[in-house]
Amino acid sequence: MDCFHGSLVSARKNCPSASAQSQVIDEYLKEEILHHSIAGPFRCPPIMNLHINRFGVIPKSTPGKWRLITDLSFPLDGSVNSLIPDSAAQVKYIGIQEAIDKLIFLGAGALMAKFDIRRAYRLLPIRTADRVFLGMRWRGNYYVDLALPFGLRSAPKIFTKFADVLEFLLSRVGSITHIQHYLDDFFLVGKPNSNECQSALSTCFHLCRE
C-alpha cells in the first residue's frame, strides 16, 4: 500500500451518511465478512495500534444500491492518504482516442462490447503489514478491512496494475485481439460482419470465471 507510519489520528465518529443509512452499513459488513474481505466484529482492537478510519456510503447509479467509502483523507494532516507519496498514487489511464483508433482500424460496422469486473477493488487483498491502517468501528465493535478499499489514494494505481496484467493475459489468449481497459471496464472490438467480438467476450467471461 506504500503508506508510511507517522502521526495518524484515529476518527472518533463515522460520516453522517453511515448513521443515516445504518441498515446499509449492517448489510455491507455482513456481506464483506462472508467474502472474507473484512474481519470482525471484535470487541477489542484485534491489532495493536489499529488505526480507525471513519466511513460512509454514497449511492451507486443503480437505484437502491450503495457503495461504502472509507474516508482515508480525514483528518487532513493525520490521515492514511496524507502519508502516501505522490509516486504511489500517480496513474496513467488510456484515452478515448485509443478506442477510437481501434474502431477506425477495423472500419465501418465494427462491433463493440464492454464488460466490467464485479467487486473490482474488493478482489485485491491488503498485505498483512498494512492492515493496521484499515480499522473501522461500528456499533461498538471493531473491524479490519482486508481488501483494497474505496477511498485509498493509491487504490486506482494498485488496481490498474492488476487490470494491466489481466488485459495482457487476455490479449494473448485465442481470439482476443483488440482489448483495452479503463480501471475495471474492459472494451472489446471485432471486425464487421464477424463473430470475433462475441467470441472474444465469451472467452473473457470464461477465463475470468476461472
Annotated model-derived regions:
Residues P16, A20, V24-T160, L207-E210:
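Catalytic-core region of right-hand nucleic acid polymerases
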Residues M1-D2, G135-R139, S175-H178:
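Short hydrophobic/aromatic-rich motifs at helix boundaries and adjacent loops
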Residues G6, N14, E31, Q180-H181:
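Hydrophobic transmembrane signal anchors and adjacent membrane-proximal interface regions, especially
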Residues P156-R209:
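Active-site palm subdomain of RNA-directed nucleic acid polymerases
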Residues M1-S17:
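Non-catalytic, polymerase-adjacent accessory regions of viral genome-replication enzymes
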Residues L8-V9, Y143-A147, L183:
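A short small-residue
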Residues A11, K114, R172-V173, E210:
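Low-complexity, intrinsically disordered/propeptide-like segments
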